[in-house]
Amino acid sequence: MQKEVVSGLLIPFLGTSLGAACVCFMKHDLSRGVQRALTGFAAGVMTAASIWSLIIPAMGMSERLGKLAFLPAVIGFWFGILFLLLLDSLIPHLHMNSEKAEGLPSKLARTTMMVLAVTLHNIPEGMAVGIVYAGVLTGSADMTAGGALALALGIAIQNFPEGAIISMPLHAEGKSKGKAFSGGVLSGAVEPLGALLTILSASRLLPVMPYLLSFAAGAMIYVVVEELIPEMSEGEHSNIGVILFSVGFTLMMILDVALG
């Protein structure tokens, strides 16, 4: 089981690293259409993971509350939304294809704020993987090793385009390929670290597991709505973003059911 957990924690990080490596062998920056497609795919995976891997299990763990089984999921979901809203307001960051930084005023370099933007929404993804594996380790009936692996694989799949989306623009901004690759990898490093810290607290987390699952879901949905959907929809020919969103959602749903 320990090997499965370690693998599960590293799989999403591997996805980011492989995506970031695209900068080493691709000669040209990603076109706007490709960026929209990849962003839509990532949004679809994150949305499906939030529902199938986090919110539904959270409600399943709260069945003892009867008709109020939705309550922990609702409370955790809103705390996740508000937590990301707070981070979004405080941490200086710059979204792709944006000229104006968000968060508190800062003298950070433009490229640093681009990395922080991706790192910001990798936090809930790392938490999600860690919480699910914590549930597996503590013997929760609603958490299975297969379901945890499905979530890790789903996030790894959507991390691949994310890694490319951050490393390629960093190179276009003037960074060397090595530094651009390092920036992409660094943006994903928060995921295994966050997941590991969550697992180390596993024994204390079981009573509040439904709240934590839905907390991670709320944080991920915030990222999808606030960042990914606008990026995949802006400009002309945004249909590709919608189509890839649907592909990502379907793939994550299949993974969760097939492996869970």
What are these model-derived regions, one by one?
Residues 1-260:
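Intrinsically disordered, metal-sensing/regulatory segments
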